[in-house]
Amino acid sequence: MNLLTDIKNQIRDYVIETTYATPEKIKDETSLFKEGVFDSMGFIMLINYIESAFEIKAKDTELLEDNFESINSIAGFVYSKINN
């Protein structure tokens, strides 16, 4: 596997474990907020998890829906932070 795939898998596992959503509900492109998977508190917990698990720091200006809307967008954000 490659790094981006590994990141996606780790994030998906976290989302499923913490929200009790079924794996069938959490696809790479599923809108996690529009589908009600995460609320504002879940978002804060997600940020804390990402910063801890991937040893990155998200700037306030990066906390945009576009960066955290789906597994794909979260993984892309994490991947870009790791490679900077």
Language-model region placement:
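Short-chain dehydrogenase/reductase
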Residues: 47
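Thiotemplate assembly-line natural product biosynthesis machinery
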Residues: 1-24, 76-84
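Catalytic nucleophile serine of serine hydrolases
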Residues: 40
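Conserved catalytic core of two-component sensor histidine kinases
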Residues: 44
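Phosphopantetheine carrier-protein modules
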Residues: 18-37, 56-64, 82
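AMP-binding/adenylate-forming catalytic domain of the ANL superfamily
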Residues: 62-73
